[in-house]
């Protein structure tokens, strides 16, 4: 279930994502009903998450602490020393809470730096039950996540007949903190990951902005055997124009796409950011990912991330998840995604509406991640006789 804690859609998305797995902890019901409804700013979210992370850390609950440290870091700019402190604490607690699993970190050489990756070995029993499943699933990060958080999503799979690899590519997570900016040719870091792990074939799943990146990679990397967009992302810049009234979106989109005149874009975006916490965060994150400062330069850089040039280039079987309450991706983009994927070996679309399925209609189906990963897991193990979801995990 997607809970509207604060009434701010962006805040509520992050709170649902981070708090969902730990709502069963003692005292969480009181906090969600008495504290969260009073949150009105990003600084309040940072303070709330930091206090709660420190509490769980002191209690030895690393599984809860790592998620909250990432939430505490989420809205902070990269130059804030607290951000790195929170990220380091999140990584330490993640490692502690997963030390009993067949999971380890890797540092993948890439250009003049390196990519952070985590590999979780397949469950042997699941692999034996589903011999037709891909042997490896590479999960691609998005606009604001870290490799640990993507692996946290992987825990929702009801079974794991495949190794799971998550990584921070250029402009993502730990790699962005190290100063490596985002790059459009996503096939390059993808190839580096496949080469490092000596993989001839792997399925690929992209989360959020990763829903676009996985398509870009699949168009250029034939070693990708299956493609999952969790969920669809046709064009990154849609996330800036979608919150606007529908009547002005086309005009705004044309201005944003051109990012001209630069002086007007810079002035307008700077003023608008003061009135919108959502826009302020998107610009802050865009600067962090691209390494650019002026809003007009950031928009020009982000404009390269669109599926349009990929038409007819993606040949793999594809699964696309979509929801009409997605605050970053217009639901009507589904027709564009279908058109771009017309040459795919197969195309399965799972579309959800807020009227009938409100949790699944949200961005990345965040209101019901167990169900979302059951759907994606079943799709990945086909044509197995029994769906992955028939096995119950404790």
Describe every region a protein language model picked out.
Residues 153, 316, 330-340:
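Short alpha-helix in the alpha/beta-hydrolase fold that links the catalytic acid
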Residues 149, 179-199, 203:
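Alpha/beta-hydrolase active-site loop
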Residues 220-299, 321-322:
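Hydrolase active-site cap/lid region
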Residues 314, 320-322, 326:
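Short beta-strand/loop motif that positions the catalytic acidic residue
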Residues 355-358, 362-394:
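Catalytic active-site module of serine/aspartate enzymes centered on a nucleophile-bearing elbow/loop
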